């Protein structure tokens, strides 16, 4: 029966690794294969007349040779709050849009290759659209604002900065018309959604470009819509029609989003910085994933800690500590169960040797031993299983926290990137081995499985963002301290108390 218990713990360790891989795979499946429900149309008060709204022509983006041959030489760099924009006189185009806090350019490689840029205007009239998007503009800079004035048509695009966003108003051109948002920002996905995202009729819809048709229309109460990546979002707020184009670019497809302009709009091209998103009502652009019910509260709690500490490293430390305190009762039961298993090991070995030719009798004797000693083999497994959703939720929280991109730790320049010297993953692996040493298995084979697991996790985490590796390392350290306190303090005090009573 000793073999049965060893097999149980082997299976549990394998199960833990498989659970990690399963949740990761499920996240990817959810992102790329689960079809979102089609949003229902709702009525909303119109800024323009309903008839005009319905009769507006679909935008023709004029992609192709003519556009790709255009050159934009006369440019001007302007500052709008926390953003830096490079604007061209030809077409009044935004050639660069840099979020200065994160040093990130929101203009994607796809947009540069196609030579189509955010906030281009499309009326459905090809001649007018060509003049609007390729004519000459005067660039007039103001205080936290810039005016792009078409020299021939006298159409004026006014971009003004307020509360972390750009407010777009257009003069000299009667709405409704279409405004181009862009394609997804060039950001590493890392198990998060990249592509079109809308909050329409109260439901957040994330779309996979491979599932789209050539032209995809959405109509309803659209709170926000646009294109997203792991850390960045580009889109608009509060409108009623949205179109996503699926365009072939090289050997893959890319999505391009436009929205129907019916009056001044709030445009956001920037990081998914929670402080900004909260101010703008864009918090749901954060990709909470399938464990949203746990991830969102943990994220908000982590951010609350950060607001009071001012350090993301300290915030991760405090959050990990608090979670360990919360899970202490489960950890206590697990350690007690493991210690009980070690105490029973000699008796279990005797039963194994005595009934090695009679598995049924061996099973009966083992169950009798469990009943006499009050040992439950599942008692060590269940507490750990209950912790898994919380650990994976914390993992997701750290994946979507853009602030880690500009947070450093000792030799690591950014907690959002991997450790360039691989020191932290090695430390993490050593803490896992130390945990194995503190709770040794009575079976050498089982101990070997534990060490192999430690090495496997080290290799798995070696290219993970340093913030995740830091969290897992701190979690291991707190677990080591917890096990020490339980074994060397609580259980010894308990046994001393029992001896005194005798």
UniProtKB/Swiss-Prot annotation:
Keyword match ATP-binding: no
Alphabetically ordered keywords of this record: Cell membrane, Chaperone, Membrane, Protein transport, Transmembrane, Transmembrane helix, Transport
Compartments (UniProt record): Cell membrane
NCBIfam families xrefs: yidC_nterm (TIGR03593), yidC_oxa1_cterm (TIGR03592)
InterPro entries xrefs: Membr_insert_YidC, Membr_insert_YidC_N, YidC/ALB3/OXA1/COX18, YidC/Oxa/ALB_C, YidC_ALB_C
Primary site of residence: membrane
Family: Belongs to the OXA1/ALB3/YidC family. Type 1 subfamily.
One GO molecular-function entry: membrane insertase activity
Any single GO CC term annotated in Swiss-Prot or TrEMBL for this entry: plasma membrane
Task performed by this protein: Required for the insertion and/or proper folding and/or complex formation of integral membrane proteins into the membrane. Involved in integration of membrane proteins that insert both dependently and independently of the Sec translocase complex, as well as at least some lipoproteins. Aids folding of multispanning membrane proteins.
Listed PANTHER family: CYTOCHROME C OXIDASE ASSEMBLY PROTEIN COX18, MITOCHONDRIAL, OXA1
Example GO biological process: protein transport
Membrane topology designation: Multi-pass membrane protein
Summary of subunit composition and partner proteins: Interacts with the Sec translocase complex via SecD. Specifically interacts with transmembrane segments of nascent integral membrane proteins during membrane integration.
Protein name: Membrane protein insertase YidC
Transmembrane segments: 12-32, 286-306, 312-332, 382-402, 409-429, 452-472
């Amino acid at each position: 029966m000793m073999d049965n218990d060893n097999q149980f713990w082997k299976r549990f360790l394998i199960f833990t690794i498989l659970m990690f891989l399963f949740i990761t795979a499920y996240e990817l499946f959810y992102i790329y294969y689960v079809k979102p429900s089609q949003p229902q149309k709702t009525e909303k008060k119109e800024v323009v007349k309903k008839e005009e709204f319905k009769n507006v022509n679909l935008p023709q983006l004029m992609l192709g040779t003519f556009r790709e041959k255009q050159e934009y030489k006369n440019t001007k760099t302007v500052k709008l709050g926390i953003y830096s924009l490079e604007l061209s006189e030809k077409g009044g185009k935004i050639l660069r849009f840099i979020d200065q806090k994160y040093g990130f350019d929101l203009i994607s490689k796809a947009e540069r290759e196609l030579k189509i840029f955010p906030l281009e205007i499309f009326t459905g009239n090809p001649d007018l659209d060509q003049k609007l998007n390729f004519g000459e503009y005067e660039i007039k800079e103001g205080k936290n604002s810039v005016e792009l004035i078409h020299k021939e048509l006298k159409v004026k695009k006014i971009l003004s900065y307020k509360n972390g966003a750009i407010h777009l108003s257009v003069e000299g051109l009667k709405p409704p018309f279409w405004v181009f948002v862009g394609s997804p920002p060039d950001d590493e996905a890392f198990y998060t959604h990249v592509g079109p995202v809308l909050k329409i009729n109260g439901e957040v819809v994330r779309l996979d470009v491979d599932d789209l048709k050539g032209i995809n229309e959405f109509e309803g109460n659209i709170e926000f819509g646009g294109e997203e990546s792991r850390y960045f979002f580009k889109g608009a707020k509060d409108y009623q029609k949205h179109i996503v184009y699926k365009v072939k670019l090289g050997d893959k497809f890319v999505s391009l989003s436009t929205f129907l302009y019916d009056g001044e709009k709030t445009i956001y091209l920037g990081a998914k910085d929670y402080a900004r998103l909260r101010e703008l009502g864009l918090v749901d652009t954060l990709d909470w994933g399938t464990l949203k019910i746990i991830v969102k509260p943990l994220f908000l709690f982590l951010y609350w800690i950060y607001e009071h500490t001012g350090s993301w490293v300290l915030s991760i430390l405090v959050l990990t500590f608090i979670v360990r305190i919360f899970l202490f009762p489960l950890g206590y039961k697990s350690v007690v169960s493991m210690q009980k298993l070690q105490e029973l090991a000699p008796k279990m070995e005797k039963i194994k040797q005595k009934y090695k030719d009679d598995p049924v009798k061996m099973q009966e004797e083992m169950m009798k031993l469990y009943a006499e000693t009050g040992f439950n083999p599942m008692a060590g497994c269940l507490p750990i299983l209950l912790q898994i959703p919380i650990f994976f939720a914390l993992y997701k929280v750290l994946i979507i926290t853009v602030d880690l991109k500009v947070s450093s730790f000792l030799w690591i320049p950014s907690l959002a990137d991997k450790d360039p010297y691989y020191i932290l993953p090695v430390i993490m692996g050593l803490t896992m081995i130390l945990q194995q040493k503190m709770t040794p298995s009575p079976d050498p084979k089982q101990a070997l499985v534990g060490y192999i697991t430690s090495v496997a996790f080290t290799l798995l985490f070696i290219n993970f963002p340093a913030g995740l590796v830091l969290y897992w390392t701190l979690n291991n350290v707190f677990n080591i301290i917890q096990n020490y306190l339980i074994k060397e303090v609580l259980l010894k005090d308990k046994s001393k108390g029992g001896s005194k009573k005798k």
